[in-house]
Protein backbone atom coordinates (compact mmCIF):
# COMPACT_ATOMS: atom_id res chain seq x y z
CA UNK A 1 0.00 0.00 0.00
CA UNK A 2 2.82 2.39 0.94
CA UNK A 3 4.59 1.69 -2.37
CA UNK A 4 1.44 2.60 -4.30
CA UNK A 5 1.25 5.93 -2.46
CA UNK A 6 4.90 6.63 -3.23
CA UNK A 7 4.49 5.67 -6.90
CA UNK A 8 1.35 7.77 -7.32
CA UNK A 9 3.02 10.77 -5.68
CA UNK A 10 6.13 10.39 -7.84
CA UNK A 11 4.05 10.06 -11.00
CA UNK A 12 2.04 13.22 -10.31
CA UNK A 13 5.01 15.24 -9.01
CA UNK A 14 7.43 14.38 -11.85
CA UNK A 15 4.76 15.15 -14.44
CA UNK A 16 3.56 18.44 -12.96
CA UNK A 17 6.95 19.90 -12.04
CA UNK A 18 8.07 19.67 -15.66
CA UNK A 19 4.75 21.01 -16.95
CA UNK A 20 5.08 23.98 -14.60
CA UNK A 21 8.67 25.03 -15.27
CA UNK A 22 8.41 24.45 -19.03
CA UNK A 23 5.98 27.38 -19.04
CA UNK A 24 8.56 29.69 -17.48
CA UNK A 25 10.10 31.45 -20.49
CA UNK A 26 11.62 30.16 -23.71
CA UNK A 27 14.84 30.08 -25.69
CA UNK A 28 13.51 29.82 -29.27
CA UNK A 29 16.27 27.75 -30.91
CA UNK A 30 16.06 25.13 -28.12
CA UNK A 31 12.54 25.43 -26.71
CA UNK A 32 10.80 24.97 -30.08
CA UNK A 33 13.30 22.48 -31.46
CA UNK A 34 10.78 19.80 -32.46
CA UNK A 35 7.55 21.80 -32.75
CA UNK A 36 7.52 22.44 -36.51
CA UNK A 37 9.51 19.26 -37.16
CA UNK A 38 6.68 17.19 -35.68
CA UNK A 39 4.16 19.16 -37.75
CA UNK A 40 6.26 18.44 -40.85
CA UNK A 41 6.09 14.71 -40.17
CA UNK A 42 2.31 14.88 -39.77
CA UNK A 43 2.21 16.78 -43.09
CA UNK A 44 4.14 14.00 -44.84
CA UNK A 45 7.62 15.54 -44.74
CA UNK A 46 10.24 13.29 -43.19
CA UNK A 47 13.78 13.77 -41.86
CA UNK A 48 16.71 12.96 -44.16
CA UNK A 49 14.37 12.75 -47.14
CA UNK A 50 12.59 16.12 -47.07
CA UNK A 51 14.78 18.13 -44.71
CA UNK A 52 18.42 18.02 -43.66
CA UNK A 53 18.79 16.67 -40.12
CA UNK A 54 21.97 15.92 -38.22
CA UNK A 55 20.39 14.79 -34.95
CA UNK A 56 17.11 14.03 -33.16
CA UNK A 57 14.67 12.15 -35.49
CA UNK A 58 13.28 10.04 -32.64
CA UNK A 59 12.27 13.16 -30.71
CA UNK A 60 10.47 14.52 -33.80
CA UNK A 61 8.55 11.30 -34.49
CA UNK A 62 7.44 10.88 -30.88
CA UNK A 63 6.35 14.52 -30.79
CA UNK A 64 4.35 13.97 -33.98
CA UNK A 65 2.57 11.14 -32.17
CA UNK A 66 1.76 13.44 -29.24
CA UNK A 67 0.40 16.07 -31.64
CA UNK A 68 -1.79 13.47 -33.34
CA UNK A 69 -3.22 12.35 -29.99
CA UNK A 70 -3.46 15.63 -28.06
CA UNK A 71 -3.47 18.25 -30.81
CA UNK A 72 -0.82 20.71 -32.00
CA UNK A 73 -0.39 22.92 -28.96
CA UNK A 74 2.06 23.87 -26.24
CA UNK A 75 0.53 21.57 -23.62
CA UNK A 76 0.96 18.43 -25.72
CA UNK A 77 4.45 19.58 -26.68
CA UNK A 78 5.55 19.88 -23.05
CA UNK A 79 3.72 16.69 -22.06
CA UNK A 80 6.18 14.71 -24.19
CA UNK A 81 9.10 15.87 -22.02
CA UNK A 82 7.08 15.50 -18.82
CA UNK A 83 6.31 11.85 -19.52
CA UNK A 84 9.99 11.08 -20.09
CA UNK A 85 10.78 12.85 -16.82
CA UNK A 86 8.18 10.65 -15.13
CA UNK A 87 9.56 7.48 -16.72
CA UNK A 88 13.06 8.23 -15.42
CA UNK A 89 11.70 9.08 -11.96
CA UNK A 90 9.72 5.84 -11.62
CA UNK A 91 12.55 3.73 -13.03
CA UNK A 92 14.90 5.38 -10.52
CA UNK A 93 12.57 4.50 -7.65
CA UNK A 94 12.48 0.82 -8.68
CA UNK A 95 16.26 0.81 -9.15
CA UNK A 96 16.84 2.36 -5.72
CA UNK A 97 14.66 -0.29 -4.08
CA UNK A 98 16.60 -3.06 -5.81
CA UNK A 99 19.99 -1.79 -4.66
CA UNK A 100 18.74 -2.00 -1.08
CA UNK A 101 17.25 1.36 -0.10
CA UNK A 102 14.16 1.52 2.09
CA UNK A 103 10.99 2.85 0.49
CA UNK A 104 11.18 6.29 2.08
CA UNK A 105 14.75 7.01 0.98
CA UNK A 106 14.11 5.62 -2.50
CA UNK A 107 11.13 7.99 -2.69
CA UNK A 108 13.12 11.05 -1.55
CA UNK A 109 15.99 10.48 -3.97
CA UNK A 110 13.52 9.85 -6.80
CA UNK A 111 11.96 13.24 -6.10
CA UNK A 112 15.44 14.71 -6.57
CA UNK A 113 15.75 13.00 -9.95
CA UNK A 114 12.37 14.42 -11.02
CA UNK A 115 13.45 17.93 -9.97
CA UNK A 116 16.83 17.93 -11.74
CA UNK A 117 16.26 15.83 -14.87
CA UNK A 118 13.96 17.40 -17.49
CA UNK A 119 12.60 20.60 -15.84
CA UNK A 120 15.87 22.45 -16.57
CA UNK A 121 14.59 22.92 -20.13
CA UNK A 122 11.05 21.54 -19.85
CA UNK A 123 10.48 20.98 -23.57
CA UNK A 124 11.57 18.00 -25.72
CA UNK A 125 15.30 18.31 -26.29
CA UNK A 126 17.76 15.96 -27.99
CA UNK A 127 20.45 16.06 -25.29
CA UNK A 128 18.04 15.30 -22.45
CA UNK A 129 16.40 12.48 -24.41
CA UNK A 130 19.70 10.83 -25.33
CA UNK A 131 21.11 11.00 -21.79
CA UNK A 132 17.91 9.86 -20.08
CA UNK A 133 17.48 6.86 -22.38
CA UNK A 134 21.11 5.88 -21.69
CA UNK A 135 20.42 6.03 -17.96
CA UNK A 136 17.29 3.93 -18.44
CA UNK A 137 19.45 1.39 -20.29
CA UNK A 138 21.95 1.47 -17.41
CA UNK A 139 19.13 0.85 -14.93
CA UNK A 140 17.84 -1.99 -17.11
CA UNK A 141 21.18 -3.82 -17.16
CA UNK A 142 21.50 -3.35 -13.39
CA UNK A 143 17.95 -4.54 -12.72
CA UNK A 144 18.43 -7.52 -15.03
CA UNK A 145 21.46 -8.55 -12.98
CA UNK A 146 19.85 -7.91 -9.59
CA UNK A 147 16.29 -9.11 -10.21
CA UNK A 148 17.01 -11.83 -12.82
CA UNK A 149 14.06 -10.60 -14.90
CA UNK A 150 14.39 -11.13 -18.65
CA UNK A 151 12.32 -8.05 -19.48
CA UNK A 152 15.18 -5.75 -18.53
CA UNK A 153 17.60 -7.49 -20.91
CA UNK A 154 15.06 -6.94 -23.69
CA UNK A 155 14.56 -3.28 -22.79
CA UNK A 156 18.28 -2.46 -22.77
CA UNK A 157 18.93 -2.41 -26.56
CA UNK A 158 15.57 -0.67 -27.11
CA UNK A 159 16.55 2.18 -24.78
CA UNK A 160 19.98 2.43 -26.43
CA UNK A 161 18.36 2.64 -29.87
CA UNK A 162 16.01 5.39 -28.69
CA UNK A 163 19.01 7.25 -27.29
CA UNK A 164 21.03 6.93 -30.51
CA UNK A 165 18.18 8.27 -32.64
CA UNK A 166 17.70 11.14 -30.18
CA UNK A 167 21.37 12.08 -30.47
CA UNK A 168 24.30 10.03 -31.71
CA UNK A 169 26.23 10.25 -28.45
CA UNK A 170 26.59 9.07 -25.70
CA UNK A 171 24.92 5.76 -26.68
CA UNK A 172 27.96 4.23 -28.50
CA UNK A 173 30.06 4.71 -25.36
CA UNK A 174 27.36 2.99 -23.32
CA UNK A 175 27.31 0.06 -25.75
CA UNK A 176 31.05 -0.43 -25.11
CA UNK A 177 30.49 -0.15 -21.35
CA UNK A 178 27.61 -2.64 -21.43
CA UNK A 179 29.66 -5.09 -23.51
CA UNK A 180 32.42 -4.98 -20.90
CA UNK A 181 30.04 -5.24 -17.93
CA UNK A 182 28.00 -8.11 -19.40
CA UNK A 183 31.17 -10.00 -20.36
CA UNK A 184 32.48 -9.49 -16.83
CA UNK A 185 29.14 -10.68 -15.46
CA UNK A 186 29.33 -13.87 -17.54
CA UNK A 187 32.93 -14.49 -16.49
CA UNK A 188 32.23 -14.10 -12.76
CA UNK A 189 28.99 -16.09 -12.54
CA UNK A 190 28.85 -19.82 -13.13
CA UNK A 191 25.10 -20.40 -12.79
CA UNK A 192 23.94 -17.86 -15.31
CA UNK A 193 20.77 -17.77 -17.38
CA UNK A 194 21.76 -18.79 -20.89
CA UNK A 195 18.79 -16.86 -22.30
CA UNK A 196 20.42 -13.52 -21.54
CA UNK A 197 22.02 -13.22 -24.97
CA UNK A 198 18.79 -14.39 -26.56
CA UNK A 199 16.84 -11.66 -24.75
CA UNK A 200 19.40 -9.02 -25.74
CA UNK A 201 19.14 -10.22 -29.33
CA UNK A 202 15.35 -10.11 -29.15
CA UNK A 203 15.45 -6.51 -27.89
CA UNK A 204 17.90 -5.62 -30.66
CA UNK A 205 15.63 -7.26 -33.22
CA UNK A 206 12.63 -5.23 -32.03
CA UNK A 207 14.72 -2.06 -32.32
CA UNK A 208 15.95 -3.02 -35.79
CA UNK A 209 12.46 -3.63 -37.14
CA UNK A 210 11.17 -0.39 -35.62
CA UNK A 211 13.90 1.59 -37.38
CA UNK A 212 13.61 -0.29 -40.67
CA UNK A 213 9.83 0.08 -40.56
CA UNK A 214 10.07 3.87 -40.27
CA UNK A 215 12.59 4.03 -43.12
CA UNK A 216 10.63 1.76 -45.46
CA UNK A 217 7.16 3.17 -44.80
CA UNK A 218 8.36 6.75 -45.26
CA UNK A 219 10.76 5.91 -48.12
CA UNK A 220 13.74 7.55 -46.44
CA UNK A 221 16.90 7.07 -48.56
CA UNK A 222 19.61 5.19 -46.68
CA UNK A 223 22.33 7.28 -48.34
CA UNK A 224 20.78 10.50 -47.02
CA UNK A 225 20.67 9.04 -43.52
CA UNK A 226 24.30 7.91 -43.64
CA UNK A 227 25.54 11.31 -44.83
CA UNK A 228 23.39 13.50 -42.57
CA UNK A 229 23.34 11.42 -39.39
CA UNK A 230 26.62 9.48 -39.46
CA UNK A 231 29.31 10.81 -41.79
CA UNK A 232 28.84 14.57 -41.50
CA UNK A 233 28.43 14.52 -37.67
CA UNK A 234 31.58 12.37 -37.41
CA UNK A 235 33.50 15.16 -39.14
CA UNK A 236 32.09 17.60 -36.57
CA UNK A 237 32.92 15.26 -33.70
CA UNK A 238 36.55 15.05 -34.76
CA UNK A 239 36.80 18.85 -34.61
CA UNK A 240 35.12 18.96 -31.18
CA UNK A 241 37.45 16.34 -29.73
CA UNK A 242 40.46 18.28 -31.07
CA UNK A 243 39.14 21.47 -29.43
CA UNK A 244 38.09 19.79 -26.18
CA UNK A 245 39.14 21.99 -23.27
CA UNK A 246 39.88 19.87 -20.21
CA UNK A 247 40.98 22.11 -17.35
CA UNK A 248 40.26 22.25 -13.62
CA UNK A 249 37.11 24.33 -14.00
CA UNK A 250 35.60 22.19 -16.77
CA UNK A 251 36.55 18.76 -15.47
CA UNK A 252 36.57 19.19 -11.70
CA UNK A 253 34.91 22.36 -10.44
CA UNK A 254 31.58 22.22 -12.27
CA UNK A 255 31.04 18.53 -11.44
CA UNK A 256 32.44 18.63 -7.89
CA UNK A 257 29.19 17.62 -6.19
CA UNK A 258 28.82 14.58 -8.43
CA UNK A 259 32.33 13.53 -7.39
CA UNK A 260 31.79 14.28 -3.69
CA UNK A 261 28.51 12.40 -3.43
CA UNK A 262 30.03 9.41 -5.27
CA UNK A 263 32.98 8.97 -2.88
CA UNK A 264 31.24 6.47 -0.53
CA UNK A 265 30.18 4.42 -3.56
CA UNK A 266 33.70 4.51 -5.03
CA UNK A 267 35.22 3.38 -1.72
CA UNK A 268 32.64 0.59 -1.38
CA UNK A 269 33.35 -0.56 -4.92
CA UNK A 270 37.09 -0.58 -4.20
CA UNK A 271 36.64 -2.76 -1.12
CA UNK A 272 34.35 -5.11 -3.02
CA UNK A 273 36.99 -5.44 -5.73
CA UNK A 274 39.66 -6.29 -3.12
CA UNK A 275 37.45 -8.87 -1.39
CA UNK A 276 38.42 -12.24 -2.86
CA UNK A 277 35.70 -14.10 -0.94
CA UNK A 278 32.77 -12.37 -2.60
CA UNK A 279 29.55 -14.37 -2.72
CA UNK A 280 27.18 -14.08 -5.68
CA UNK A 281 25.25 -11.15 -4.19
CA UNK A 282 28.41 -9.15 -3.54
CA UNK A 283 29.70 -9.95 -7.03
CA UNK A 284 26.51 -8.61 -8.55
CA UNK A 285 26.57 -5.53 -6.33
CA UNK A 286 30.16 -4.87 -7.42
CA UNK A 287 29.16 -5.15 -11.10
CA UNK A 288 26.17 -2.82 -10.63
CA UNK A 289 28.24 -0.18 -8.83
CA UNK A 290 30.96 -0.43 -11.49
CA UNK A 291 28.32 0.03 -14.19
CA UNK A 292 26.95 3.18 -12.59
CA UNK A 293 30.39 4.70 -12.02
CA UNK A 294 31.27 3.96 -15.64
CA UNK A 295 28.06 5.71 -16.69
CA UNK A 296 29.02 8.78 -14.66
CA UNK A 297 32.40 8.95 -16.41
CA UNK A 298 30.77 8.68 -19.84
CA UNK A 299 28.16 11.35 -19.12
CA UNK A 300 30.77 13.79 -17.81
CA UNK A 301 32.78 13.25 -21.00
CA UNK A 302 29.60 13.72 -23.03
CA UNK A 303 28.85 16.96 -21.20
CA UNK A 304 32.34 18.27 -21.96
CA UNK A 305 31.90 17.40 -25.64
CA UNK A 306 28.52 19.11 -26.03
CA UNK A 307 29.77 22.46 -24.65
CA UNK A 308 26.18 23.29 -23.65
CA UNK A 309 24.70 24.18 -20.28
CA UNK A 310 25.13 21.31 -17.80
CA UNK A 311 22.21 18.88 -17.91
CA UNK A 312 23.62 15.92 -15.94
CA UNK A 313 23.11 17.21 -12.40
CA UNK A 314 20.29 14.69 -12.01
CA UNK A 315 23.16 12.21 -11.49
CA UNK A 316 23.58 13.71 -8.00
CA UNK A 317 20.41 12.16 -6.48
CA UNK A 318 21.17 8.87 -8.26
CA UNK A 319 24.75 8.86 -6.96
CA UNK A 320 23.47 9.84 -3.51
CA UNK A 321 21.03 6.92 -3.51
CA UNK A 322 23.77 4.47 -4.56
CA UNK A 323 26.22 5.81 -1.98
CA UNK A 324 23.51 5.64 0.70
CA UNK A 325 22.64 2.02 -0.14
CA UNK A 326 26.26 0.84 -0.25
CA UNK A 327 27.19 2.77 2.91
CA UNK A 328 24.46 0.94 4.85
CA UNK A 329 25.72 -2.41 3.57
CA UNK A 330 29.46 -1.96 3.95
CA UNK A 331 30.08 0.86 6.48
CA UNK A 332 26.85 1.26 8.48
CA UNK A 333 27.99 4.73 9.57
CA UNK A 334 25.07 6.99 10.40
CA UNK A 335 27.17 10.16 10.16
CA UNK A 336 28.18 9.27 6.63
CA UNK A 337 24.50 8.77 5.81
CA UNK A 338 23.73 12.21 7.26
CA UNK A 339 26.50 13.68 5.11
CA UNK A 340 25.10 12.08 1.95
CA UNK A 341 21.59 13.32 2.70
CA UNK A 342 22.86 16.83 3.52
CA UNK A 343 24.82 17.09 0.25
CA UNK A 344 21.83 15.73 -1.66
CA UNK A 345 19.41 18.28 -0.16
CA UNK A 346 21.85 21.18 -0.61
CA UNK A 347 22.71 20.40 -4.25
CA UNK A 348 19.16 19.58 -5.29
CA UNK A 349 17.98 22.90 -3.86
CA UNK A 350 20.93 24.78 -5.39
CA UNK A 351 20.45 23.45 -8.92
CA UNK A 352 16.68 23.62 -8.71
CA UNK A 353 16.93 27.35 -8.06
CA UNK A 354 19.61 27.87 -10.71
CA UNK A 355 18.11 25.82 -13.55
CA UNK A 356 14.38 25.56 -12.82
CA UNK A 357 13.56 28.76 -11.01
CA UNK A 358 16.11 31.03 -12.73
CA UNK A 359 16.06 29.11 -16.07
CA UNK A 360 19.82 29.16 -16.62
CA UNK A 361 19.70 26.37 -19.22
CA UNK A 362 17.64 28.58 -21.54
CA UNK A 363 19.76 31.70 -20.91
CA UNK A 364 17.21 33.52 -18.72
CA UNK A 365 19.21 33.73 -15.50
CA UNK A 366 19.09 37.56 -15.63
CA UNK A 367 15.44 37.79 -16.64
CA UNK A 368 12.77 39.63 -14.68
CA UNK A 369 9.95 37.10 -14.90
CA UNK A 370 7.40 39.67 -13.77
CA UNK A 371 7.73 41.08 -17.31
CA UNK A 372 6.71 37.79 -18.92
CA UNK A 373 3.59 37.91 -21.09
CA UNK A 374 0.94 35.31 -21.86
CA UNK A 375 2.01 33.69 -25.13
CA UNK A 376 -1.66 33.15 -25.97
CA UNK A 377 -1.49 36.71 -27.34
CA UNK A 378 0.72 35.36 -30.12
CA UNK A 379 -1.36 32.26 -30.78
CA UNK A 380 -3.98 30.31 -28.85
CA UNK A 381 -1.95 27.14 -29.28
CA UNK A 382 0.74 28.57 -27.00
CA UNK A 383 -1.67 28.75 -24.06
CA UNK A 384 0.15 28.27 -20.76
CA UNK A 385 3.54 29.60 -21.85
CA UNK A 386 4.77 32.75 -20.12
CA UNK A 387 6.64 34.49 -22.92
CA UNK A 388 10.06 35.93 -22.19
CA UNK A 389 13.18 35.09 -24.22
CA UNK A 390 16.87 36.10 -24.21
CA UNK A 391 16.35 37.97 -27.50
CA UNK A 392 14.08 40.65 -25.98
CA UNK A 393 14.70 39.95 -22.33
CA UNK A 394 13.52 43.42 -21.23
CA UNK A 395 10.80 43.79 -23.90
CA UNK A 396 8.86 40.52 -24.23
CA UNK A 397 5.67 42.31 -25.30
CA UNK A 398 7.54 44.02 -28.16
CA UNK A 399 8.82 40.65 -29.31
CA UNK A 400 5.29 39.23 -29.28
CA UNK A 401 4.04 42.18 -31.36
CA UNK A 402 6.86 41.72 -33.89
CA UNK A 403 6.00 38.03 -34.18
CA UNK A 404 2.28 38.76 -34.53
CA UNK A 405 3.10 41.19 -37.35
CA UNK A 406 5.22 38.54 -39.05
CA UNK A 407 2.46 35.97 -38.65
CA UNK A 408 -0.17 38.31 -40.11
CA UNK A 409 2.01 39.28 -43.07
CA UNK A 410 2.88 35.66 -43.87
CA UNK A 411 -0.74 34.55 -43.61
CA UNK A 412 -1.61 36.98 -46.42
CA UNK A 413 1.31 36.02 -48.66
CA UNK A 414 0.33 33.75 -51.52
CA UNK A 415 2.88 31.57 -53.27
CA UNK A 416 4.92 28.64 -52.06
CA UNK A 417 7.24 29.62 -49.25
CA UNK A 418 9.69 28.25 -46.75
CA UNK A 419 10.35 29.87 -43.39
CA UNK A 420 13.84 30.13 -41.92
CA UNK A 421 13.69 30.90 -38.20
CA UNK A 422 14.52 29.87 -34.65
CA UNK A 423 10.84 30.46 -33.80
CA UNK A 424 9.97 27.01 -35.05
CA UNK A 425 6.21 27.15 -34.73
CA UNK A 426 5.33 29.35 -37.71
CA UNK A 427 4.89 26.52 -40.21
CA UNK A 428 2.42 24.73 -37.95
CA UNK A 429 0.54 27.92 -37.01
CA UNK A 430 0.29 28.98 -40.68
CA UNK A 431 -0.34 25.43 -41.88
CA UNK A 432 2.58 25.84 -44.29
CA UNK A 433 3.34 22.33 -45.53
CA UNK A 434 6.43 23.27 -47.53
CA UNK A 435 9.06 22.36 -45.00
CA UNK A 436 12.33 24.25 -44.82
CA UNK A 437 15.18 22.13 -46.30
CA UNK A 438 16.93 22.31 -42.90
CA UNK A 439 15.40 21.53 -39.54
CA UNK A 440 17.31 24.45 -38.04
CA UNK A 441 20.05 26.84 -39.06
CA UNK A 442 23.19 27.21 -37.01
CA UNK A 443 26.93 26.91 -37.49
CA UNK A 444 26.87 23.14 -36.90
CA UNK A 445 23.75 22.06 -38.78
CA UNK A 446 24.97 23.60 -42.04
CA UNK A 447 28.41 22.35 -43.16
CA UNK A 448 31.19 24.89 -43.24
CA UNK A 449 32.66 25.81 -46.64
CA UNK A 450 35.79 23.83 -45.74
CA UNK A 451 33.77 20.73 -44.88
CA UNK A 452 33.66 18.03 -47.55
CA UNK A 453 29.87 17.78 -47.17
CA UNK A 454 29.26 21.44 -47.95
CA UNK A 455 28.36 20.78 -51.59
CA UNK A 456 26.23 17.77 -50.62
CA UNK A 457 24.16 19.98 -48.34
CA UNK A 458 24.00 22.78 -50.91
CA UNK A 459 22.72 20.43 -53.62
CA UNK A 460 20.19 18.97 -51.17
CA UNK A 461 18.93 22.46 -50.28
CA UNK A 462 18.58 23.55 -53.92
CA UNK A 463 16.90 20.29 -54.93
CA UNK A 464 14.14 20.83 -52.33
CA UNK A 465 13.53 24.40 -53.50
CA UNK A 466 13.31 23.19 -57.08
CA UNK A 467 11.15 20.14 -56.32
CA UNK A 468 8.63 22.12 -54.26
CA UNK A 469 8.67 25.10 -56.68
CA UNK A 470 9.39 27.53 -53.84
CA UNK A 471 8.85 31.21 -54.69
CA UNK A 472 9.77 32.90 -51.40
CA UNK A 473 12.24 32.56 -48.55
CA UNK A 474 11.15 34.30 -45.36
CA UNK A 475 13.58 34.94 -42.51
CA UNK A 476 12.10 35.55 -39.06
CA UNK A 477 14.64 36.72 -36.52
CA UNK A 478 17.86 38.65 -36.67
CA UNK A 479 20.96 37.76 -38.70
CA UNK A 480 19.85 34.36 -40.06
CA UNK A 481 20.16 35.69 -43.62
CA UNK A 482 23.77 36.70 -42.88
CA UNK A 483 24.95 33.12 -42.44
CA UNK A 484 27.74 32.22 -44.88
CA UNK A 485 25.54 29.69 -46.66
CA UNK A 486 22.82 32.23 -47.44
CA UNK A 487 25.31 34.98 -48.30
CA UNK A 488 26.78 32.71 -50.95
CA UNK A 489 23.30 31.69 -52.12
CA UNK A 490 22.22 35.32 -52.56
CA UNK A 491 25.49 36.37 -54.22
CA UNK A 492 25.30 33.54 -56.75
CA UNK A 493 21.71 34.37 -57.73
CA UNK A 494 21.24 38.00 -58.77
CA UNK A 495 17.64 37.17 -59.65
CA UNK A 496 16.72 37.26 -55.94
CA UNK A 497 14.76 40.31 -54.78
CA UNK A 498 14.97 41.17 -51.07
CA UNK A 499 12.49 43.16 -49.01
CA UNK A 500 12.51 44.07 -45.31
CA UNK A 501 8.92 43.70 -44.14
CA UNK A 502 9.44 44.39 -40.43
CA UNK A 503 12.12 44.41 -37.74
CA UNK A 504 12.06 40.62 -37.56
CA UNK A 505 10.83 39.66 -41.05
CA UNK A 506 12.78 39.61 -44.32
CA UNK A 507 11.43 38.43 -47.66
CA UNK A 508 13.52 37.02 -50.51
CA UNK A 509 11.64 36.55 -53.77
CA UNK A 510 13.24 33.71 -55.75
CA UNK A 511 10.33 33.18 -58.16
CA UNK A 512 12.36 34.47 -61.13
CA UNK A 513 15.37 32.26 -60.42
CA UNK A 514 16.20 29.03 -62.22
CA UNK A 515 18.01 26.45 -60.11
For the regions a language model picked out, list residue spans one by one.
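Perimembrane helix-loop-helix junctions
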Residues: 173-206, 327-329
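Membrane-interface alpha helices of multi-pass inner-membrane proteins
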Residues: 152-170, 174-179, 293-304
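Membrane-interface transmembrane helices that cradle and orient dolichyl/undecaprenyl
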Residues: 98-100, 135-155, 163, 187-190, ...
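Extracytoplasmic catalytic/substrate-binding loops of multi-pass membrane glycan-assembly enzymes
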Residues: 22-37, 47-63, 72-75, 218-222
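Extracytoplasmic
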Residues: 169-170, 219, 345-514
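Transmembrane-helix signature of polytopic, membrane-embedded enzymes
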Residues: 92-115, 150
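Short acidic/glycine- and proline-prone juxtamembrane loop motifs at membrane-interface regions
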Residues: 122-130
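Transmembrane-helix motifs of polytopic, lipid-linked glycan transferases
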Residues: 79-103, 136
Amino acid sequence: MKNKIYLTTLFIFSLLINQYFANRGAFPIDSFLSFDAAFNIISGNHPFKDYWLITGPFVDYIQALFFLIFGINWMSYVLHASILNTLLCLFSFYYFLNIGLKNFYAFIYSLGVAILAYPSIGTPFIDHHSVIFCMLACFSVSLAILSKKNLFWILTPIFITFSFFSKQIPSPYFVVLFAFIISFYFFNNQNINKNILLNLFFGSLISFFLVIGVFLVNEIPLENFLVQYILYPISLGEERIDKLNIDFKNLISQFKYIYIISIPLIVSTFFLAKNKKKNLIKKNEFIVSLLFLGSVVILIYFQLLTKNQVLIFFLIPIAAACSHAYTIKYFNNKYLIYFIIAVFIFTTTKYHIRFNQNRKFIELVNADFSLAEDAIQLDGRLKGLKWITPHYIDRPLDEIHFLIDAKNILSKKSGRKIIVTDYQFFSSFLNNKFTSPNKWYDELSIPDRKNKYYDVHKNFFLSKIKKNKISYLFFIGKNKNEMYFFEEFFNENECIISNELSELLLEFDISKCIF
